[in-house]
Amino acid sequence: EEESIMEEAIGSKIADYLIKPVKPSQILLAIKKNIDTNRLVEEKTTSDYQQEFRNISMKLASSMNKEEWYEIFKKLTYWELELERSGDESVEQILGMQKTEANSQFFRFIKNNYQDWIKGENAPLMSHNIIRKKVVPHMSETKPTYMIVIDNLRYDQWKIIEPSILKDFEVLKDEMYTSILPTATQYARNAIFCGMLPSEIQKRFPDMWKNDEDEGGKNMFEEEFLLDNLQRLGKGGSKASYTKITNLDFGRKVVNKIPNMKTNSLNVIVYNFVDMLSHARTDMKVIKELADDDAAYRSLTASWFDHSPLKDILKQIAKQDANLIITTDHGTINVNKPSKVIGDRNVNANLRYKQGRNLNYKKSDVFEMEKPLDFYLPIQNVSSKYIFAKEDMYFVYQNNYNQFVKFYKNTYQHGGVSMEEMIIPIITLKTKL
């Protein structure tokens, strides 16, 4: 009855409490709750997934549209996170096989539909349309809109950092969109800001677009592309800012600049850390060990976010009456199966897509674009083509084949065709003020 006793007990992290008069069933439930919780949760989660497994398998065996693919990917991600928490490794392996089958079917779906989509026929929301369709409608002169593009953020990584963000923000729309191909920053993110497809960007801005073989940064003109896009969309008179964060020190400086951004109609912030993390995992042994699989990769993302300037930036935005759009340019996939490719020295280095001439490859491993201009992709010469790796494959040259197979196996790569790379989050939120 003493409130102070209860407060002190709860503050001391007691496991549970019983209210007199105590019944035997209360004692049994309290013991079960504290001793058997993990086992009971694991059993219930496993049972629920086994039921859902059949539903997902039936869906995969049918002909699905783009919205159904989004739902399947959401479900697979949900169960991946749930089973990870429950710790049932045997069921996690079954889910892994189901995801592999889903990616195999998704690859066929993309091969059959991508060219129509890129021409605007029955297309899902894609990279080059998100500013026009999802950002500009929120812009006003009385309330700032923030667009945060976290490079290389997969849907599962979003679900991991989401609970922390929702302490200060309310979700208005939790949506997916489809990245263009290649699922690489120079193509996808330039398309986002310019509101055009790559060959259209090259035509409009020949001095600003860089092809794979060109030296120098490939995303150096995003601000110019953004402002040109806003001008074409009738928002040229609106105040807009663009900020790219590529290191910790600059991120901390941006935290202090957020209060001054509230008078702008649109503030775009590009955050590069997650992309650097995936590339570092290939190059650095210590990162390889920290992020050995998807679960560890998610854990590393959560740890980074909790201690990053991005979290502080969001805390500052939360103090304003503002709209917030969080999205990304593409995802990434853990690659495990090598596919041999032969090409001349001008072929690009990416392991998930190749462009060039005189390419030799196994046709069943790739989505090939023999006429890239039909897919709005720039070409180096008239005989250039693009190929994209399917599922969790990665391209390896014939020279030093075994050495490179071993080096790149179980690393995170992007540029190809998979659900993880192409189906990506775009979340519309508002502050809780």
Explain the meaning of each model-derived region.
Residues A9-A15:
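As written
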Residues I5, D16, V22, L28-L433:
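Feature captures the catalytic ectodomains and active-site-proximal regions of enzymes
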